[in-house]
């Protein structure tokens, strides 16, 4: 039993479960804290009133992607429930298209008021999110399974990046680095480039 617990495969499995648990908890916190925006009250929406429908599309689509994403990447679920996997995959793609489109509009309207670095970094993240999702869908249609799995994983990394950067702004360490306008662009960049790099290094190893 001791040898099994120290085996690389066992440690990798436990690490994946730990990462999955952290992602699910962080996503749940993010979803709960975003629900107040659906009150449609101007005093709650603030500067987002003119683009509220894009904001709602971004949040609702993002929620759909967050919920369906883990089951798409879970190999046991894919093998056992293929029809459900396809249906959930369509929901995921539609959710990302809505959410990424909303993010691009928000990055063009609300974000420049914070800083151009923040606006540009959000544009890039939303484009990567949308692009990787469409490539995951395209490779699935062509039955290029290995490529599909890789692009689907990259897509979900971009999905989680929106949660990661939103929660990172509330960390005391990030707050000490500077004002929101000063650190926002860097935080958004790091939220997806670091995990994306780590995934591709692990994939090629």
Where are these regions (language model features)?
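Alpha-helical membrane insertion/targeting regions
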Residues: 1-205
